[in-house]
Amino acid sequence: MRVVIQRTGHASVTINGTCKSAIRKGFMILVGIEETDGKEDIDWLCKKIVNLRVFDDENGVMNKSILDIDGEILVISQFTLHASTRKGNRPSYIRAAKPEISVPLYEQFCKELSFALGKEIGTGEFGADMKVELVNDGPVTILSLIHISEPTRRY
């Protein structure tokens, strides 16, 4: 599973000219699912995301989590996170899971993340052509590559 976590002042996703989801201060998360991803990866990642201390405390030190600031989360499915550009000039997405695997895992990830956050999260629409806008705060951007089910591949 590949995840890009961006600390944001606000973010939104628009589909066919209509705003589907919008958030204020929090995280805008891009998530790419692989064939080998599973529930263990989702559980670990959701716990990690809500406990990441990347928001400033009263002293300007990144010491608060999204739970501490009562922040919001917007999650966007992004199979292109699995692009391989080693050969040629056209990216290969062979590592990205097929929709029959990735859709249920994406939905489970969103459900578990919402539960861990303690409130609803915003989402895009799997497979849709989306326009995503955000103000990256900091900027703070964290790339997380995780395979709990395959410890030797842990990044």
PLM region spans:
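Compact, glycine-rich, soluble single-domain proteins
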Residues: 19-70, 80-111, 116
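Single conserved hydrophobic/aromatic residue that forms the stacking wall/gate
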Residues: 146-155
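Residue-level signal for inorganic ion chemistry
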Residues: 45, 76, 140
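Positively charged, low-complexity, intrinsically disordered RNA-binding extensions
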Residues: 93-145
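Short beta-strand segments
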Residues: 6, 32, 77, 133, ...
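Glycine/charge-rich, flexible interdomain linkers and switch-proximal surface loops
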Residues: 58-73, 122-134
